[in-house]
Amino acid sequence: MYCSDYHTHSQLSPDSSAPLEQMAQAAVEAGLDELCVTDHCDLLTLQGEPVERYDWPPAVAQYQAAAAQFSSGLTLKLGLELGMGHLNPAAAQTIVGQPELDFVLGSVHNQSPEKGGVDFYYVPYPDSAACYAALDDYFASMAILAATPCYDVLAHIIYPLRYMEAPVSLEGYYDRIRAILRTAVENGRGMEVNTYRGRTVAEWKPILELYRDCGGEILTVGSDAHIPGGVGKGIREAMELIAGCSFRYVCTYDKRKPVFHKL
């Protein structure tokens, strides 16, 4: 089974201090075949201020140095996690036009600007009502993002749940999630199973079933690791879940094109 971790962060993300070489070494030690670094580029800051560009030269230089160091034993790819790209499609398209880029995750990390624009990490969730209000806003933004051309795979479509402690069910959102996934499928894009460093695997089963019903085939798996110790966490379990949901492949990417690996 070809094992890849397609959601990882390095010192070029504001919430990580790990050199890419350390993340790559951790991938080797975890027995992975392929690692994609997907550092953050969010078009809103954590507090909701707009951003219009990304500093590519340090990212390309770090990637090229690590790729040379790990030229045998590990395939290393250059990706990007582009957050809130739907808010500025022109800027998003410029950012993802980098020729060295292999892969783009499209994510929603923030509330909509109308709701304040802050990262869902900072939103208070005192009760279930607050959780559902946040989810309403989140899936509305995700629906807009899904229709844009600035990503290859939708990242962690259940993202806000990781911060919510009150009881929450996604069943009331299945129609919205199905519509989001159908939009991605119709545009030749895919979905990520994000293990949240091994903490969320089983939660993806109903989402995978919705994706399958939409005709989805492109799936990537990512740990969302921000430190070497998180690399590869939950990847094999996620692949087993994917196979159990009747999918035949997981994907990696090369210059924005999916490569299918049989499960």
Model regions and ranges:
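Short amphipathic alpha-helices and their capping/turn segments at secondary-structure boundaries
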Residues: 20-33, 87-102, 134-150, 208-209
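Structural recognition of alpha->loop->beta junctions
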Residues: 97-103, 148-149, 207-223, 236-251
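Hydrophobic residues within beta-strands of alpha/beta enzymes
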Residues: 35-37, 104, 154, 191, ...
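Active-site core of metal-dependent hydrolases
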Residues: 188-198, 219-228, 235, 249, ...
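C-terminal regulatory/interaction regions
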Residues: 245-248, 257-263
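Domain-core and long-helix interface of multi-subunit machines
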Residues: 14, 107-216
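An N-terminally biased module of ancient metal coordination in phosphate/nucleic-acid-related enzymes
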Residues: 1-86, 95-96, 160-174, 179-180, ...
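Active-site gating/metal-coordination segments in enzymes
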Residues: 12, 68-116, 120-127
